[in-house]
């Protein structure tokens, strides 16, 4: 028997049909619109045979199980973002407790750098070792890191454990999106990714609230004592609920498949680039030998990384083909710019509220709800729109447009700005973020190959984190340099000036200097204004870059390529070629279903990316694909190339006889016109 993959003429679903030696065939259904062969031993970058066989981990679930697994993924995403942003409002208190007022920004920077360094790796690791195993490792890492943060006695210990938290959080957010992409179809993916985006906003809301509540009433350490068991619950849920399609191959084969040169070069490049960028202007002088040498080394390894990925890696962590079209390149640029703007807001809005407005941690967290709650709501709405309408471009345009309006409004903030201006600015920005985060991801998946699904997600998250790290470093330098320049013009006591310059992110106690309070707050306001002005054109650039994104609907890259090919083949057939240019052993389906070819030597049938082997088809049958068959192979049974193919839904179905090798399927009676 030979197998053939096609779809119903009414629904965007793939139907696998097996035609045996009688005019009957079993039918099974797979609800995914994405199609690729399982265990394809193909070098994904160069099309050559690879020693490691990639395993298709698509695992479409029945609805009841889907809701359970997706709920677990949503909970993991919530915990991850609670952990990432829960300590932002507590940093001033942590700095005082650990005597680290001049270095406390590294509590956030260390996690973000570690997140960025490892983010690019998770896609390929999950391809090689399986989603479940890698997921369990990163969740256990998060639990251990949070326990370490809770027990930290020095700032150095805290920064190290926050770095491990960053490694784990990067894996959790990335793998959650990959798993959801495995268990739902592309058409439904916008809806489910939208709910995940809502969990991001919810985590960004709950985390600061819990951090503020624990800091003011218990201790900042209590935040981590809460997050650690929540992470443990994630591990238990993943272990018992997440289904696993374990990739084939031995542990040695899997270990050899890792792109070690790429991993080494990317890690060295990012560390050597981000550390001086994060500390330049505040902890290190920009023209110091250390900063210059680290930037040069990082730049060299960054170039080496892309050379390795493009020309030498057999299984690259970041295949350069994901930048190969204008649309995909624009979407990846979105990720970098979006990371700069979004992380800048997350870190510098609370600073404005606490340092300049003098609000408590709880009030600052409450004001931030205007942004993150709106983000959560609009993410769900935009995801529903994507799934129902099958389009994404107008959502992305609207998102970056309204985000730009909010960023412009933020540039008019003053020390005494009224609440209406603040709230509407945050509402507009939150709505914009909600319409950009997940729709850009769904668009990138729709425009890329199925086998690139995991690396598209990890690369996109990596670029967003990289943009965030660079953006925070630049914003930090802008604020520090603005404060220095502004305070030099004021007649401040030297001890107060040195105190501010050494720790620009932690407002000193001005009760001892009441006469200088307004001057210091004005300097902080000018610095924050400069940061907001810097972020505004970044968002505007995202809007401009969107013109390069094309909306082809929620179809897979393979399906669009197949349709383009068959349209060309149909044109040839209608122009009178009558299949004359087909090579021996081929059959052409000249409608919108792709090219069907048979290799007579291996007795195999190919449809698109799918292959089915065994015996030839019987004489006098019609393949259940809507279209017209043409063939010129003597090895094929005779058939009229003008026979009209009966639509699948017109076939009569009956149970297979007990002797059938596919007894779990259904018999389809082939009908001829």
Swiss-Prot record:
Pfam families on file: MFS_1
Which residues get glycosylated? Answer: 99, 217, 526, 599, 662
Q: Where in the cell is it found?
A: Cell membrane
The GO terms this record gives for MF are: citrate transmembrane transporter activity; transmembrane transporter activity
Q: Where is the composition biased (Polar residues)?
A: 21-39
Indicate, by first and last residue, each region the UniProt record lists as having compositional bias (Basic and acidic residues): 564-596
| Keywords of this entry | Cell membrane, Glycoprotein, Membrane, Transmembrane, Transmembrane helix, Transport
* InterPro entries on file: MFS, MFS_dom, MFS_trans_sf
> Which BP terms does GO give this entry?
citrate transport; export across plasma membrane; transmembrane transport
- Segments of this protein annotated with the region Disordered: 1-44, 564-608, 636-673
Q: What PROSITE patterns does UniProt report for this protein, alphabetically?
A: MFS
Q: Which GO terms describe its cellular component?
A: plasma membrane
Reaction(s) the record says it catalyses: citrate(in) = citrate(out)
How does the record classify its membrane topology? Multi-pass membrane protein
Result of knocking out the encoding gene? Abolishes citrate export.
Q: Please give the start and end residues of each transmembrane region.
A: 67-87, 103-123, 133-153, 164-184, 194-214, 222-242, 261-281, 292-312, 322-342, 364-384, 393-413, 419-439, 465-485, 529-549
The UniProt entry lists the main location of this chain as: membrane
User: What family is this?
Assistant: Belongs to the major facilitator superfamily.
Tell me, in a sentence or two, what this protein's role is. Transmembrane transporter that exports citrate across the cell membrane.
PANTHER family, sorted? MAJOR FACILITATOR SUPERFAMILY, MAJOR FACILITATOR SUPERFAMILY (MFS) PROFILE DOMAIN-CONTAINING PROTEIN-RELATED
Q: What is this protein called?
A: Citrate exporter 1
The record lists the organism as: Yarrowia lipolytica (strain CLIB 122 / E 150)
Identify the taxonomic lineage of the organism of origin. Eukaryota, Fungi, Dikarya, Ascomycota, Saccharomycotina
